[in-house]
Amino acid sequence: MEFFTMCMLAAGFGMAIGAFGTGIGQGLAVKNAVEGVSRNPGASGKILTTMMIGLAMIESLAIYVLVVCLIILFANPYKDVAIELAKAVVK
């Protein structure tokens, strides 16, 4: 396949896997926080604060994956090499 097509596929699959992992992690965190609050309603403030901090950390994974995918798509260091190879093949 062409280099840029492979870059688009890699970015798409990378973002899909990153979003899937982030969604599973956030779902499990919220599930456990809700279970903790249902067992001990008095500790809901500490549990919810800790959950929010944890969710922010988990969400940072999706942001990092997005940044890497954008780098693959728009600031790829091998773009010039691929263009030169394509020109050589065309000649």
Swiss-Prot record:
Give disulfide pairs as residue numbers.
none
Q: Which domain of life is it from?
A: Bacteria
Which GO BP terms sit in this record? proton motive force-driven ATP synthesis
Pfam families in the record: ATP-synt_C
Q: Which InterPro entries match?
A: ATP_synth_csu_bac/chlpt, ATP_synth_F0_csu, ATP_synth_F0_csu_DDCD_BS, ATPase_proteolipid_c-like_dom, F/V-ATP_Csub_sf
- SUPFAM superfamilies per the record? F1F0 ATP synthase subunit C
Annotated compartments: Cell inner membrane
Sites marked Reversibly protonated during proton transport: 59
Keywords from the UniProt entry: ATP synthesis, Cell inner membrane, Cell membrane, CF(0), Hydrogen ion transport, Ion transport, Lipid-binding, Membrane, Transmembrane, Transmembrane helix, Transport
Q: What does this protein do?
A: F(1)F(0) ATP synthase produces ATP from ADP in the presence of a proton or sodium gradient. F-type ATPases consist of two structural domains, F(1) containing the extramembraneous catalytic core and F(0) containing the membrane proton channel, linked together by a central stalk and a peripheral stalk. During catalysis, ATP synthesis in the catalytic domain of F(1) is coupled via a rotary mechanism of the central stalk subunits to proton translocation. Key component of the F(0) channel; it plays a direct role in translocation across the membrane. A homomeric c-ring of between 10-14 subunits forms the central stalk rotor element with the F(1) delta and epsilon subunits.
What is the protein's given name? Answer: ATP synthase subunit c
